[in-house]
Amino acid sequence: MSPRDDIPDLKGFDGDGEGSVQVHDSEDIGLDVGGARVFSVYGQGGIGKSTTSSNLSAAFSLLGKRVLQIGCDPKHDSTFTLTGRLQETVIDILKQVNFHPEELRPEDYVTEGFNGVMCVEAGGPPAGTGCGGYVVGQTVKLLKQHHLLEDTDVVVFDVLGDVVCGGFAAPLQHADRALIVTANDFDSIYAMNRIIAAVQAKSVNYKVRLAGCVANRSRETNEVDRYCEAANFKRIAHMPDLDSIRRSRLKKRTLFEMDDAEDVVMARAEYIRLAETLWRSTGEPGLTPEPLTDRHIFELLGFD
């Protein structure tokens, strides 16, 4: 049996003749997630989105919110600092029941993590096959069928890398606000510029708007701030390159479970401020930046 034999028929998804899968509108797209406020976290691969998402979810929970975090990466490591372990993905659990979701119970694919944060790993199809957008859609449908979104105040989507194809842009179809994690360097800012363009394209037909960016693992923010000024964007948080954050990952914990060192307390406070800012942002007009051309970015941030 090949890996492709495990992939269900992707209704509403057609190949383009070049080995890829393109996403088209279908009944699965734009599912209502009830009254929850939905945030989708994007950024260059390896920039720290999962660390940001998990600590953000923890911060929301400490503000008294009922939180659900959904990891949208085949690595399924988005939530392990919240749960202390790697959990099975929705797509793998669906395979076990031959893609009959009616046979599943919430406890089969939802794990309770730090301070009551509910954790789900959507996973993804085998490399080179299927579509991540299908997996996200099926995960949201499953959560709705089990009425898990009705008792949730905040949903955080932690999305794979800086991929801006239709499949991994699927969380944008459910989100109120998109948050971009970047660093104070050319490559991650270049990726952020592309993500901004993708979000702006989705915002034509969906409610998603940009909330701003987080300068992550960066001592300075001058390059991020220069880009934001040029693109009419906004940095809403700064997470320095702290060894305590790396240690928390190694210990499989959020920052809120670490010892009260000075830098840990500072980082916790910044995550609480970020959560408060994002919560308020859904009641305000979203940002409307203008993505820069490649030439403009090179002239602004590139080497002389």
UniProtKB/Swiss-Prot annotation:
Cofactor descriptive note: Binds 1 [4Fe-4S] cluster per dimer.
One MF term in the entry's GO annotations: 4 iron, 4 sulfur cluster binding
Pathway entry: Porphyrin-containing compound metabolism; bacteriochlorophyll biosynthesis (light-independent)
Tagged with keyword Oxidoreductase: yes
Record-listed E.C. numbers: 1.3.7.7
Listed InterPro entries: NifH/chlL_CS (IPR030655), NifH/frxC (IPR000392), P-loop_NTPase (IPR027417), Protochlorophyllide_ATP-bd (IPR005971)
Cross-referenced Pfam families: Fer4_NifH (PF00142)
Binding residue positions for [4Fe-4S] cluster: C131, C165
SUPFAM superfamilies (UniProt xref): P-loop containing nucleoside triphosphate hydrolases
Cofactor field: [4Fe-4S] cluster
EC class (word): oxidoreductase
Amino-acid positions noted as binding Mg(2+) in the UniProt annotation, renumbered to this chain: S50
Catalytic activity field: chlorophyllide a + oxidized 2[4Fe-4S]-[ferredoxin] + 2 ADP + 2 phosphate = protochlorophyllide a + reduced 2[4Fe-4S]-[ferredoxin] + 2 ATP + 2 H2O
Residues given in the record as ATP binding sites: G46, I47, G48, K49, S50, T51, K75, N216, R217, P240, D241, L242
Alphabetical keyword list: 4Fe-4S, ATP-binding, Bacteriochlorophyll biosynthesis, Chlorophyll biosynthesis, Iron, Iron-sulfur, Magnesium, Metal-binding, Nucleotide-binding, Oxidoreductase, Photosynthesis
Gene Ontology biological process terms from the UniProt entry: light-independent bacteriochlorophyll biosynthetic process; photosynthesis, dark reaction
UniProt family annotation: Belongs to the NifH/BchL/ChlL family.
Oligomer status and interactors: Homodimer. Protochlorophyllide reductase is composed of three subunits; BchL, BchN and BchB.
PANTHER family, alphabetized: LIGHT-INDEPENDENT PROTOCHLOROPHYLLIDE REDUCTASE IRON-SULFUR ATP-BINDING PROTEIN
Main function: Component of the dark-operative protochlorophyllide reductase (DPOR) that uses Mg-ATP and reduced ferredoxin to reduce ring D of protochlorophyllide (Pchlide) to form chlorophyllide a (Chlide). This reaction is light-independent. The L component serves as a unique electron donor to the NB-component of the complex, and binds Mg-ATP.
The protein, known as: Light-independent protochlorophyllide reductase iron-sulfur ATP-binding protein
Organism: Rhodobacter capsulatus
The encoding gene: bchL
